[in-house]
Amino acid sequence: MKIDKLEGKLILKNPKIIDPLNETIFQNDVMLDNNKIVQIGSIKLTDDIKTIDCNGLVLTPGFCDLHVHFRDPGNGDKETLESGSKSALAGGFTRVCTMPNTVPAIDTPELINNTKLKNYQYIFIL
């Protein structure tokens, strides 16, 4: 389930939460305020706060794909940094590591830095 950027408060009611930091999986409510988690626990519902029933759904941190082929630079007709980043984000991946199978191959510090700088324009926030 994708939640578009919202202003104000939102309650995710009863998702299964995977917390890798504490190595726990539990079920509870989550309150967001301007897209930031502000409370986890039993939250009293009110009519003025939008609520989404997440029973049966899983809430996790974003995933990292360690092997992507964006083909940019050189073969942008197959996949660009922008299209690949948007596709990754739609699939729950908030970080990606691109392979150097590009033209030219991204295999020198200079090319890595240039690609990194180009990537900054493709930071997408949900």
Region spans (language model):
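Active-site metal-binding motif and surrounding structural segment of the metallo-beta-lactamase
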Residues: 44-59
